[in-house]
């Protein structure tokens, strides 16, 4: 019995076949990495944040209906058929905390607006924005003082009008 050792050329062919087979089908570790990375980077905002954002976009004193809130939550990617109980629970908790105020209806129905706590926070943010903008406005005011104030211009026009009226008589 003679042992036939495979030639070096046959090893190369076999190795080439193995590489081709592995390159066509992704390994299990590669297929697991792909979806996990995508889900970690694309995270949805919480339901309460979505609700508060939609109510805040409407304004402090305006109302938002339950249907409009459901539509906003479903647009962000939540399945409302499966998450209706969660949606109702989040709404009721926001009302209890004082972040939302229920204008009409009972329970998790009716229309809602921002509560006092949330309205106060939004007013503080608006004041901060105004403070940031004031230095820019002061600069424009100083330029106006160099050119002349509007009050002095109005006084000049009043004097001209009086003179014109006096000449007509």
Curated annotation (Swiss-Prot):
One of its GO terms (cellular component) is nucleosome. Residues 118-142 have a biased composition (Basic residues). Keywords: Chromatin regulator, Chromosome, Developmental protein, Differentiation, DNA-binding, Nucleus, Phosphoprotein, Spermatogenesis, Transcription, Transcription regulation. Residues 1-36, 118-154 are annotated as: Disordered. The modification Phosphoserine is found at residues 62, 65. One of its GO terms (molecular function) is nucleosomal DNA binding. GO terms for biological process: chromosome condensation; germ cell development; heterochromatin formation; negative regulation of DNA recombination; nucleosome assembly; spermatogenesis. It is found in: Nucleus; Chromosome. Residues 1-10, 19-36 have a biased composition (Polar residues). It comes from the Eukaryota. Pfam families: Linker_histone. Residues 43-116 form the H15 domain. Belongs to the histone H1/H5 family. DNA-binding protein that may be implicated in chromatin remodeling and/or transcriptional regulation during spermiogenesis, the process of spermatid maturation into spermatozoa. This is Histone H1.9.
